[in-house]
UniProtKB/Swiss-Prot annotation:
GO terms for molecular function: endopeptidase activity. SMART domains: Proteasome_A_N. NCBIfam families: PRK03996.1 (NF003075). Keywords: Cytoplasm, Nucleus, Proteasome. The keyword 4Fe-4S does not apply. It comes from Trypanosoma brucei brucei. InterPro entries: Ntn_hydrolases_N, Proteasome_alpha, Proteasome_alpha-type, Proteasome_asu_N, Proteasome_sua/b. The lineage of its organism: Eukaryota, Discoba, Euglenozoa, Kinetoplastea, Metakinetoplastina. It comes from the Eukaryota. One of its GO terms (biological process) is ubiquitin-dependent protein catabolic process. This is Proteasome subunit alpha type-2. It is found in: Cytoplasm; Nucleus. PROSITE patterns: PROTEASOME_ALPHA_1, PROTEASOME_ALPHA_2.
Length: 231
């Protein structure tokens, strides 16, 4: 293989950074995660997949709180995501200590994207093999962002990442409306996950977080069971 296939900072003759493409492929092979923005909040949901039926699924996390007003989920390599989650949490803490208010979501996303991008042009490292969905609320309203290994980010009304992303996005395009409220958004997120779920969908192998009234919360197993009984 050519040097450009291995070198992180070497462009191929066609103008591609191949290692970033490999990282994007790794992110796309992870379990499905998705986000839905409502008029009064944001929902993010993800499939949890253990490597063995003997593993305790409650110790596996796919949705994380970053601060009181923001959380995220991911698809791809779990340890890579944890590095980004820790960095995002530190950024939120520093902002609170400095300005005595929650960090704006757009500013947090830019900070995370800088870290993503830094690992695409430095020697001795590799790109992060995961994509993130960030959901939060600030003085400008509710927000849903997607970040990719290249450091690129976008805002979305509804989107998905992971191996089931194409089918999930098609389902969301058919079901999403601009008037959707948070309860319907939770149902839509779970129905979308269920469409491409690998096996039986339960409260133990699914995780959901939502932003309601400016605060981010993780749904409990009991809350998830109630929602799953309704779909």
């Amino acid at each position: 293989m050519s040097e450009s296939s291995y070198g992180l900072t070497t462009f191929s003759p066609s103008g591609r950074l191949v290692q970033i493409e490999y990282a994007t492929t790794a992110a796309s092979k992870g379990t499905t995660a998705l986000g839905v923005k409502a008029t009064d909040g944001v929902v993010i949901a993800a499939e949890k997949k253990t490597t063995s039926p003997l593993a305790d699924s409650l110790t596996l996390h796919k949705v994380f709180a970053l601060d009181d007003h923001v959380g995220c989920t991911y698809s791809g390599i779990g340890p890579d995501c944890r590095v980004l989650v820790d960095a995002a949490r530190r950024a939120c803490q520093r902002y609170r200590l400095t300005y005595h208010e929650p960090m704006p979501i757009s500013q947090l996303v830019r900070q995370i994207s800088f870290l993503f991008q830094e690992f695409t042009q430095s020697g001795g490292v590799r790109p992060f093999g995961c994509s993130l969905l960030v959901a939060g609320a600030d003085s400008r309203g509710n927000h849903l962002y997607q970040l990719d290994p290249s450091g690129t980010f976008w805002t979305w009304k509804a989107t998905s990442i992971g191996k089931g992303s194409p089918d999930a996005r098609t389902f969301l395009e058919k079901r999403y409306t601009n008037e959707m409220e948070i309860e319907d958004a939770v149902h839509t997120a779970l129905l979308t996950l269920k469409e491409g779920f690998d096996g039986r969908m339960t409260a133990e192998n699914t995780q959901v977080g939502r932003v309601v009234e400016g605060r981010f919360e993780l749904l409990t197993v009991e809350q998830l069971k109630d929602y799953l009984d309704q779909i």
